[in-house]
Amino acid sequence: MATNGHFASLGGDSSDKTAYEHGVQVIDENKEFNPNLSKYLSIEDVTPAGFNYHLISVFGSQSTGKSTLLNHLFGTRFSVMSELERRQTTKGIWMSKNKNTEGSMASNILVMDVEGTDGRERGEDQDFERKSALFALATSEVLIVNIWEHQVGLYQGANMGLLKTVFEVNLQLFLKDKNTTHRSLLFFVIRDFVGMTPLKNLQKTLMEDMSRLWDSISKPAGLEKSTVHDYFDFQFYGLPHKGYQPEQFVAETKKLSLRFREGHKDPSLDAQKGEFSDGGVFLPEYHRRIPADGFSRYAEGIWDQIVNNKDLDLPTQQELLAQFRCDEILREVMVAFDEAIVPFEDKQSQAARLGEPEILGGLGAAMRTARAKAVKSFETEASRYHKGVYQRKRAELESKIDTRLKALFQGQLNATHKSGINEFSDAVTTAVKSGQKKGTGYDFAEIVSEEVKKAMEKFEEVARTTTVEGTSWSDYSQELALYEKELAEVSARLRRDEMRRLATRVERWVQSRLGESVGLEFNALGSGRAGGGAPETGDKPTEKKFWDRVWNVFVETVLDAERRFTDRASSFDASLEEVDVGLWRLRRKSWGVLRAKIDEEMIEGNLLLKLRENFEDKFRYDDAGVPRIWRPTDDIEGVYTRARESTLTLIPLLSKFKLSETSAPPPLDRWVGHTPSSATAADEEDLPPIGGVDEEEGKSLEEEMTILSDSKRQELIVRFKKAADGVYVEAKRSAIGGMTQVPLYFYGILLALGWNEIIAVLRNPAYFFLLFVCAVAAYVTYQLNLWGPILKMTEAASNQALAEGKKRLREFLESSDTGRQAIAMSASGSEQHEMSRLNKQGKAAASDEDGDDL
C-alpha cells in the first residue's frame, strides 16, 4: 500500500474529492500545518455542522496497529504498516471523517491518527511527541490509548511517559483558563486481549499507574490534592488478536464502534472504585465548543502557538478564532445586506443631488427584512463562538446596519417632509382657485384644516411603514413635530397671502365704487343750473357741500368694504391681529384710491372743462333750465357776470378738501387709526405715506388735503376767464346777428324779376302742388330743428361720393394700360401723391406734406 507521503501530496495540492479519500494530513513530519484542512472539511460536509461533530485522537507506540484499529472502527483508509517491513507508516498527524455507515454511531466523527511514539526515526527527539499530544488534547474529546495486553504494567511499553505528558499539558491548559475544567476521555483499547487476565484487573493496574503518574507531576498551588479523576474520565475495552482471531477481532471492533455515540454520565458510577461506563463516549463536557466552520482556523492557531513554544492559551485562541470568524461572517452578512439596501441608497442620493425629494416605495419592508435577515444570519453562524466576542461583534454589526438604515430613514422622512410641504401648498392653492372659479365661495380655514390632516396622515403613514422595530432611531416624534410646525408656518403664510389677495380684491372693489361714485359727484359740477345758491334739500344739491358728499361716499364705501373683508376673513380662521392689520391697510389703500381719483378729476384739462360746462349751464340756461335765445334787449353782460362769478367760487372750493360743517379737513388721521402693534415691515413697505397720519412724512393734514396749489389755482382762473369770455363773445354776436334785416327794395326787385315764374307756378297745378309740398316740408323741418342734421348729412354724403369717385378713378388708372402709362409719365421728375390725399385744388394735403417731413 502507498505511504502517507503520497496522501499528503494529494491532500495538499488537489481539490478533487478523490484526493482526500485517505484523509488529509493535518500536520506533516516537518511540523507544517496543512492550509487545506478547511477545504477537506467542506468536501466532507462537516463545515455546516456547527457543534454537531466529534473529534477523536489515537495515541500509542509506533507500529502497534493504531491506523488498523481506526480503519476497522470508522471505515477510514489510513495507511497501515506492511507486515514485511517494520518501519514508520504514519507521519505527523492525519485526519479522516468516519466512513462507517452504522446508523447508531454519532454523525460527523473526525478521527486523528497521531504519529506513534518511541519510533526509531525520531529516536531521542521527543519534541514532536509532546507537541502532538498537546495539540490532540487541545482539540480532541476522546483520546484512544492503543496498548497491547502484555504492555500493561510497563512504563515505556504502556506509554506512561506520553500519558504523563498529557497530564502535564492538561494542567497547563487549566492554569490558563481556571474558569473551565477541560475534561477529556482516556479510552484504553487493550489489543491482543486473550482473557487470561480479567479486564477488571487490567483496569485496576492501569488506574493505579494513572494515579501514580498524576501524583508524580508538579501541581500548582491549590491543586495539590486534586486527583486524575477531576480532569479525566476513563473507559476500557479489550480486543482479540487480529492475526490469530480475525473473525473475533472484526466482531469486537464492530461492537466497539457502537460505543462512539452521544452518551450521558451515570452519577451512580464511582471511577475510584473501578466502576466505569460502557455506554456512549461523547459527553457534552468533552466538546471543545469550537464550531466546525472555525475548526481549521482554531487548529492552525493552536498549532502555531505549540510549534513556536508559546504557552498555549485556549481561551485566547478561542477569542482569536471568534474574532476572525465573526469578522468573516460579518463581511458575508453585509454583502447580502448591501444587495438589498444599496439600490435604495443610490436612489435617495440621486434624488438629493437633483433636489427632487422622492419617497422610496417599499423602503420600510426592505429595511426590516434586510436587518432581520442580517442579524439572524450572523446570530446563526457566530453565536457558536466565544460569547463575549460574539456579543461585541453583533453589536458592531447592528451599529453598522443601523447607521446606514438611520440615514435612509432620515432621508425618507426629509423627502416626505419636503414633498408633503409642496403638495400641501399646491393642494390649498388648487382648492382656493377651484372655489373661485365655481363662484360658490369657499372656506379657506376648512380647506387648510383638511389638507393639514391629509399631510399629517401621509407623513405618519410613511414614517410608520419605514420604522424598524427595536431600534432607537425609529422614533420619529421629533420629525413629526417639526413637520407639523412647518405646516403651521406654511398655513399662516398661505393665509397671509390669501388675505393679501382678499385685500386686493376688496381694494379693486373700492376703486371701482369710488371711481363711479366720486366721478358722478365731479360730473355734477358740470351742471350748474341750480347755481351756488341751490337749496339744501331736493334733487339739486348745493355745490358748497361737494366735499361733504365725497367724504360721505368714501366713508360709506370703505365701511362696506370693511364688512366684506371681515366677513371673508372669518372663513380664513384669521386672528384678530391679522384682521386689524388688514383693515388698517384697507383704509390706507382706500384713501390712496380716493386721492388718485380726485387728482384724476382735478387734472387741469378735466377741471377746466367742468368749469366751462358749469358756466355755460348757468349762462345759456335760465333758472328753470330753459335755453336762452339772446336778443339785443337782453342783459347779456349781467347774466355773464353772475354766471362767471358763481363758477369762479368753485375754484377755491375745489382747491382744498374741507367739510362745510366744520370748515376743516375731514378727520383722516382718526379715521385711518394708529399702526397696529402686530403690523410688520412687510405690511407697511407697499403703503404710500399719508400727510397728517405718518409723522415721518413731514406733511400736515392741511397739506394732505390741499388739492390745488395757489399757482395752479391762479392759472386755472385765467384760463377759465378766457374760455368764459369766448362764450360771452359768441352770445353777443348771435344777438347782434339777429338784428340784421333784408331791405324792402330787395323784395320789390325779387317780385319784379320773378313775376313770370310766379305766374307760371300759380297757373300750373303740378308746380303749385310741388311748391306747396316743399313749403310744408320746410316748415315741418324747421319746427323739428332738423335743418342742421340734414345739412350735415348732405355734406357727409357729398364728401363720401367724392372719396368714392377718387377711389374708382385710381383703380381705373391702375388697372388699364393707358392709365398706367399716364401715371408713369407724371411720376418722372415729380412727386407722387395718393389721390385720396389731394385737395380741391389738386395739390397735396397738408397732412401728406407733414408725413413726408417725418
Curated annotation (Swiss-Prot):
The organism's place on the tree of life at top rank: Eukaryota
Membrane topology: Multi-pass membrane protein
Principal subcellular localisation of the protein: endoplasmic reticulum
Compositionally biased region (Acidic residues): 682-695
Pfam families: RHD3_GTPase (PF05879), Sey1_3HB (PF20428)
Transmembrane domains' residue ranges: 742-762, 766-786
InterPro entries named in the record: G_GB1_RHD3_dom, P-loop_NTPase, RHD3/Sey1, Sey1/RHD3-like_3HB
Enzyme class, broadest EC rank: hydrolase
Entry coiled-coil feature ranges: 474-500, 695-715
GO cellular component assignments: endoplasmic reticulum membrane
Binding site for GTP: G60, S61, Q62, S63, T64, G65, K66, S67
Cytoplasmic side: 1-741, 787-854
Family (UniProt): Belongs to the TRAFAC class dynamin-like GTPase superfamily. GB1/RHD3 GTPase family. RHD3 subfamily.
Function according to Swiss-Prot or TrEMBL: Cooperates with the reticulon proteins and tubule-shaping DP1 family proteins to generate and maintain the structure of the tubular endoplasmic reticulum network. Has GTPase activity, which is required for its function in ER organization.
Protein name: Protein sey1
Organism annotation: Aspergillus terreus (strain NIH 2624 / FGSC A1156)
Organism ancestry: Eukaryota, Fungi, Dikarya, Ascomycota, Pezizomycotina
